[in-house]
Amino acid sequence: MSEGRLQERLLRRFEGVIDPWQDTEQDVLPREAWAFILYFARQAKGPFLLLLIAGGLAGAVDAALYWSLGWLIDLLESTEPERLFADHWPVIAGFILLVFVVRSAVMIGSAILEQQVIVPSFFSLVRWQAFRRVIEQPYAFYQNDFAGRIATKIMQGGEAVGDFIINILQTIWSFLTFIVLTLTILVSLDPLLGVVVALWFLGYAAIIRFLLPEIRRAGRETADQRSIFNGRLVDAFTNIMAVKLFDSGRREHAYVREGLANFLAAAARLTRAITSVRAAVNLLNGAMMGAVAAIALWSWSQGGISTGAIAAAMGLVFRLNQMSGWMMFNINGLIRNYATVQDATRTISVRPAIQDAPGAITLARARGELLFDNVTFRYGEGQKVIENFSLHIRPGERVALVGPSGAGKTTIVNLALRLFDVEQGRILLDGHDIRSITQASLRAQFGVVSQEPMLMHRSIRDNIAYGRPGASEEEIIAAARRARAHEFILSVSDPRGRRGYDAHVGERGVKLSGGQRQRIAIARMILKDAPILILDEATSALDSDVEAAIQENLAALMQGKTVIAIAHRLSTIAALDRLIVIDEGRIVEEGTHAELVAAGGLYAQLWKRQSGGFLAERLAAE
């Protein structure tokens, strides 16, 4: 077995100590950063306790090393060279053991704990549990934030929690242990030396107390501006087609530059605060080292301490000077991580506005009866979109929602899916208030094809089977054939050479045309075979020949199912059982196509304005 494989096998044993997939989904994550950090630390308390011990040992070994060095110098001064090993070999062996065995064992153990046990698994544990909470947020949550910004908070939050704990338990605890032992050793040599270090520590603590809060404030602002800037970058790249079509690259320059400038200004305030702290620490350290050197030399000149004691004292304070510099950097990192965690909790620790009710039922396959009972709804604090809306859809009935843009058609569908909760009234599915049904089993009853197909950057196979995981290859292909997608799927390839059903479609399906994306979405709905179908301009991106062929399959698919169709092209829904005409969130007409045309109302006006199947929006003056 090669050395590399042996090393891999030895280290891999430590990587499974922390289970990153622990299920704590029922817990409510704390909103305050410190409580948030402790919540996750408790899930890996064993490794963190060992890290605390290792950090203390590291500080103790460092202090013992300098003390031993001073003792060794005194030993050399008092011993004839030819008698050194004969008389003092146990002491020399002990010193070598301390330097090469004990210190190495502590450092290697700390490295294994940090890099093999904690970093990969614990960081992933935080990110996984954060993702589990965020993915349960309602649709409105994602409408109010950048997707890239949310993803950044999950990634950075996981790293910040881990780094914060490691920093405290290993680096800072080791530093504090070293200070206490240094103070103890120096007091034993000369109390004045201990007084100098004690005063130095008070000054160091004062810098942390009075100067670091500015770093904390600047760090929090920097984290906010970093997230905003990252969100602007993702927004520009996600909508690159719009950027190209409107030739708005220079406008995006200004938009992104503004975000970068705000981040740069926040970062500059942070670095100014850091520079001030570093200057103060360097002045304090210089004063400490000068005072210790002067007192140690004076004490030696008076016969109070030995040469070895001077070496030990100076070695300890030089090490303290070295540690305090990078310790201030670590404390700064600690504050940055705390600010990052606090920023992340504002997203990750938000209790979902829509949750399953206690004791919510899991609905099996529904009959498809929907009842909107005096429903009122508005987005946020805005104007009511739906007001006192009532509609009964019988099982197996095919209904179309018709009306001008902004009438509330898509909102009605979103309320049925419980993407939003009604403000007043209720919605019943098979006699059950949808708020009393688990969200998962509620949405399992619906097959949806929207005007803008929702595809993942995964394989075509995965996208078709998204609503029915575990579907066989034959079932996936059959659904694709019914959606008239099989032929073009076979010709699709991606930059990594994957072809056909294995090809990845790009972010939001960007590698496919609008018609191809819509056919894959229809195939997904066909495969899911839900009892209620929602068709929101389901064939709007298709050419006439393909649309006609798919309409035949959709007609067959609709048999025995409840259908809610939304269409601006009235010709696509004229044959449905009942047309519901909506205007400003209210039902103004309902009936068959023939009945509504004969009535001469709003539907008849819309029908007359059709030109090539397109429904023009009503003029504001009408």
Model-identified regions with their sequence ranges:
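Transmembrane helix-loop-helix hairpins at lipid-water interfaces of multipass membrane proteins
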Residues: 48-106, 187-194, 294, 303-307
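Cytosolic ends of transmembrane helices, especially the final helix of ABC transmembrane type-1 domains
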Residues: 248, 272, 319-347
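Hydrophobic alpha-helical transmembrane segments of ABC transporter permease domains
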Residues: 53, 65, 118, 155-199, ...
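Conserved catalytic Walker-motif region of ABC-type ATPase nucleotide-binding domains
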Residues: 134, 256, 372-374
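Membrane-integrated ABC transporters
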Residues: 1-62, 77-95, 110-118, 132, ...
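Loop segments that connect adjacent transmembrane helices in multi-pass transporters
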Residues: 145-148, 221-269, 341-343, 347, ...
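Juxtamembrane loop-to-helix connectors within ABC transporter transmembrane domains
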Residues: 33, 41, 110-115, 119, ...
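ABC-type nucleotide-binding domain
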Residues: 363-622
